[in-house]
Amino acid sequence: MKIAILSRDGTLYSCKRLLDAANKRGHVVEILDPLSCYMNISPAASSIHYKGRHLPHFDAVIPRIGSQMTFYGTAALRQFEMLGSYPLNESVAITRARDKLRSLQLLARQGIDLPMTGIAHSPDDTSDLIAMVGGAPLVVKLVEGTQGIGVVLAETRQAAESVIDAFRGLNAHILVQEYIEEAKGRDIRCLVVGNEVVAAIERQAKDGDFRSNLHRGGVARIADITEREREIAITAAQTLGLDIAGVDILRANRGPLVMEVNASPGLEGIEKTTGVDIAGKMISWIERHATPGYYLKTGG
């Protein structure tokens, strides 16, 4: 097959692993910067061009689209879909997952347990917003934040009010969430491929921090997950329409709670910790599901 990887940086670990895994299986792979793609949109002659050339048809596209380029990155992916390429995560699913409010609403409607969560833009009554999620301590997040950026633990009501007021001054959407103290700065990252959790790690925040993101200095070890956690991770990914997902779960006293579903999970930390060939499993999924011309038949 001919496969395109959409990424701004082909030197990243995840891209190199996917490239290597696909090449080992005999596929032809090209890494494309989605921001350098430009498109002709017309009923009879739609096409994609890249750095002065008309791109050929790709059997499959692997989107590795960063959060800051979601709009144009998914637009480029959508064009590939309309031209008949199979996407490893559809553009609509990526957009859905990147919208934190929308994704939480869909997960809640599906009956998936979440931390108590409130969202606001300019709350007239900060005290009521805080009370709505059970009071302090609580976590205040910028809806657009990623990798632990724009996330603050407010241990008292006064601190929570100050953080919310400060974030409100940024003209940003604010997400307020109960703090799961018993998690002790740990979470579980489940890597879902299709209808299977292929690997899972427990991430522990560094001393003095509650954010377990590996980008923030957290450490990881192999996680032994329960059948319930496995079911929740798969259901969360399927609820958002994702074939590939990193599902973050907190272990609370009342049971596992989904924190977030990542549509473009990094492979480095989880592959190096578990030794699982996740990139190979992703390519294998493409081989089993990339039906030629599927999106041409369905309209994308």
Swiss-Prot record:
Mg(2+) 1 binds at D248, E260. The keyword Cytoplasm does not apply. Binds 2 magnesium or manganese ions per subunit. One of its GO terms (cellular component) is cytoplasm. It comes from the Bacteria. Keywords: ATP-binding, Ligase, Magnesium, Manganese, Metal-binding, Nucleotide-binding, Protein biosynthesis. Coiled coil: none annotated. ATP binds at K141, E178, Y179, D187, R211, S212, N213. It holds the Pfam family RimK. One of its GO terms (molecular function) is ATP binding. This is Probable alpha-L-glutamate ligase. GO terms for biological process: protein modification process; SOS response; translation. Residues 104-287 form the ATP-grasp domain. Mn(2+) 1 binds at D248, E260. Its cofactor is Mg(2+); Mn(2+). The keyword Manganese applies. Mg(2+) 2 binds at E260, N262. NCBIfam families: PRK10446.1 (NF007764), rimK_fam (TIGR00768). PANTHER family: RIBOSOMAL PROTEIN BS6--L-GLUTAMATE LIGASE, RIBOSOMAL PROTEIN S6 MODIFICATION PROTEIN. SUPFAM superfamilies: Glutathione synthetase ATP-binding domain-like. It comes from Enterobacter sp. (strain 638).
